[in-house]
């Protein structure tokens, strides 16, 4: 199960948690993915899409 948007290809970002003592530990920020039924290439499929693609209308939800 990949954590990548099937429309825009947005995936995880990598960085560090930084404490007050300036200690750094690596961490990952995941995109807000939703599993929705959408029309893709004329067929209804269940796809993982980020909320930005849903809000901006890049995806048409199946009824």
Swiss-Prot record:
Molecular functions per Gene Ontology: structural constituent of ribosome
A biological-process GO annotation: translation
InterPro entries attached to this UniProt entry: Bacterial_rp_bL28, Ribosomal_bL28, Ribosomal_bL28/bL31-like_sf, Ribosomal_bL28_bact-type, Ribosomal_bL28_sf
Keywords associated with the record: Ribonucleoprotein, Ribosomal protein
GO cellular component terms attached to this protein's record: ribonucleoprotein complex; ribosome
Top-level taxon: Bacteria
Family assignment from sequence similarity: Belongs to the bacterial ribosomal protein bL28 family.
Xref: NCBIfam families: L28
Protein name: Large ribosomal subunit protein bL28
Organism this protein belongs to: Geotalea uraniireducens (strain Rf4)
């Amino acid at each position: 199960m990949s954590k990548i948007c099937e429309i825009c290809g947005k995936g995880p970002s990598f960085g560090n948690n930084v404490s007050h003592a300036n200690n750094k530990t690596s961490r990952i920020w995941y995109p807000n993915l939703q599993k929705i039924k959408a029309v893709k290439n004329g067929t209804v499929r269940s796809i993982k899409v980020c909320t930005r693609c849903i809000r901006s209308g890049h995806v048409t939800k199946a009824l």
